[in-house]
Swiss-Prot record:
PROSITE patterns: UBIA (PS00943). The keyword Transmembrane applies. It comes from Rickettsia felis (strain ATCC VR-1525 / URRWXCal2). One of its GO terms (cellular component) is plasma membrane. It is found in: Cell inner membrane. This is Protoheme IX farnesyltransferase. GO terms for biological process: heme O biosynthetic process. Pathway: Porphyrin-containing compound metabolism; heme O biosynthesis; heme O from protoheme: step 1/1. The keyword Transferase applies. It comes from the Bacteria. Carbon 2 of the heme B porphyrin ring is defined according to the Fischer nomenclature. Pfam families: UbiA. HAMAP family: CyoE_CtaB (MF_00154). The lineage of its organism: Bacteria, Pseudomonadati, Pseudomonadota, Alphaproteobacteria, Rickettsiales.
Length: 305
């Protein structure tokens, strides 16, 4: 059953005093936490020595870069955020931060993130960070999100790059290992996002964002989730087969992947309240965190020293 969402008139908002918490929320802290963690794992797995201070600078720059992209995304999407139930409490929509302030904050934060990555770490990591911010804002947010059913698939490049940036921050190179880290997140993103779209379908229809369930229907979306889940299972085992991680990783990641497949299959038997989609979405977050925790704890290559 569709739930009516009352749109918020952005022109009639009574703007309040901004707080530090508002600016933290502007940077999408939940997304940022995943970016920081996967970026750190990329740093950890690079088979080179790096001073902890440099590693710390790299993590901070990755975090600020993600926050910058999140802030500019909220600035651009403030119109559709006002139409969606799950985004109506975002800082710009509720009047805690002016749109122009959010844009300025995002641009300045992004500039310093890229600048200090170049100054203190290396140019490759800085370029990758700049590319990630640009891709998320221009390719995903501005171009794809409102136009293409493949918005999440193609746009997922930006979300998959943090471990590559972290790896490059230490090694000053892009290797097979970092590409596999990229692929794990890249293939994980569509089923994760489409599960969210299944139980937020009314929101996306209301603001005319062409998410797959709204355009192709739930059954087609569930089939796509299953296909990507199978691909993810295969790719997640690759670190063992290239000698990147040990046998413990193979067994544990295999079990986690089978559970992921179970949840994706359970979507075909979901109830009208989308209980299975919500469970799958929650598990997908746990899955990615745990896979990257495994990648760092069962590595057979050098660590930070």
């Amino acid at each position: 059953m569709s739930s009516l969402v009352t749109p918020i008139n952005l022109d009639k908002i009574n703007h309040s005093q901004s707080t530090v918490k508002d600016y933290i929320l502007l940077m999408k802290p939940r997304v940022m936490s995943l970016v920081i963690f996967t970026g750190f794992v990329g740093i950890w797995l690079a088979p080179y020595s790096v001073h902890p201070f440099i590693a710390g600078i790299a993590v901070v720059c990755i975090a600020l870069g993600a926050g910058s992209a999140g802030a500019i995304n909220m600035w651009y999407d403030r119109d559709i955020d006002s139409l969606m139930k799950r985004t109506q409490k975002r800082p710009i929509v509720r009047g805690a931060i002016e749109p122009d302030e959010a844009l300025s904050f995002g641009l300045i934060t992004g500039f310093f993130a890229v600048f200090f990555m170049a100054l203190c770490v290396n140019l490759l990591a800085s370029f990758l960070l700049l590319f990630t911010i640009f891709y998320y804002i221009c390719i995903y947010t501005i171009w794809l999100k409102r136009r293409s059913i493949q918005n999440i698939v193609i746009g997922g490049v930006s979300g998959a790059l943090p471990p590559v940036i972290g790896y490059a921050a230490v090694s000053n190179t892009i290797s097979l290992e970092s590409i596999i880290l990229f692929l794990i997140i890249f293939i994980w993103t569509p089923p994760h996002s489409w599960a969210l779209a299944l139980f937020c379908n009314d929101d996306y229809k209301n603001c005319k964002v062409p998410m797959m369930p709204a355009v192709k229907g739930n059954l087609y979306t569930k089939k796509q989730i299953l296909i990507y889940s199978i691909l993810l299972f295969i790719v997640s085992l690759m670190p063992f087969f290239i000698g990147m991680n040990n046998f413990i990783y193979l067994i544990t990641s295999g079990i986690l992947g089978l559970v992921f497949l179970y949840y994706s299959g359970s979507l075909f038997y979901d109830t009208p309240d989308n209980k299975q989609a919500k469970r799958f979405f929650a598990y997908s977050i746990f899955y990615l965190f745990f896979i990257f925790l495994l990648l760092s704890s069962t590595s057979t290559i050098s660590l930070i020293s």
